[in-house]
């Protein structure tokens, strides 16, 4: 009985997290649609680190990908996992992903999320913390899914490569569970619908080696 209860509790938790996960991008203010992303010349990585660091250790402050993006990172307010910044030139750290030991970075596809579509396998992703510490990752997967019911947080999703269909909960597990990694998330606009699909870009830690 205890095992079954634990399984049901975990299933309910995963479902709640899944709903939060999709609401974070789907229910964004209409005003965000009027702010079109305008990329500027990116700063050097050294200059970017100086701009975002504030002395706070273990607080994620920025993400940098050469020739693609240089975004300060804002944190979600406590108790508000649906929050996504409406400021152009920013990404938002997804607090729910942190509960899984992973890093989720959210942005509206009308703002900084546009740059997420320029990410490709093999690119280096550098995370900058408040104390200047840098953590490096490599992009390993770019996943694109069509939302079969774009206006519903309960939508099922079709993989645009292969046609696999996933539930909301299965999608959450696919992109946010597992060993430590970074997931970029934004919506895909198609056929005049800003929420037609979802884009996820996954990056794994760069292996480190020591000499004996």
Where in this protein do the model-derived segments appear?
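Bacterial Sec-dependent N-terminal signal peptides
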Residues: 2-6
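Solvent-exposed, non-transmembrane regions of membrane-associated and secreted proteins
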Residues: 31-212
């Amino acid at each position: 009985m205890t095992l079954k209860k634990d399984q049901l509790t975990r299933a309910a938790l995963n479902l709640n997290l899944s709903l939060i996960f999709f609401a974070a991008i789907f229910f964004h203010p209409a005003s965000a649609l009027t702010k079109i992303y305008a990329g500027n010349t990116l700063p050097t990585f050294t200059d970017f680190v100086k701009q975002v660091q504030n002395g706070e250790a273990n607080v994620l402050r920025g993400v940098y990908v050469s020739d693609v993006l240089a975004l300060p990172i804002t944190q979600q307010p406590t108790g508000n996992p649906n929050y996504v910044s409406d400021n152009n030139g920013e990404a938002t750290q997804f607090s729910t992903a942190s509960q899984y030991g992973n890093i989720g970075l959210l942005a509206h596809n009308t703002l900084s999320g546009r740059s997420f579509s320029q990410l490709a396998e093999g690119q280096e992703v550098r995370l900058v913390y408040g104390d200047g510490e840098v953590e490096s990752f490599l992009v390993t997967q770019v996943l694109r899914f069509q939302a079969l019911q774009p206006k519903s947080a309960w939508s099922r999703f079709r993989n645009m490569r292969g046609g696999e269909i996933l539930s909301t909960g299965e999608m959450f597990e696919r992109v946010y569970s597992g060993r430590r990694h970074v997931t970029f998330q934004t919506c895909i606009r198609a056929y005049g619908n800003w929420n037609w699909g979802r884009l996820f870009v996954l990056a794994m830690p760069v292996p480190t080696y020591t000499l004996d």
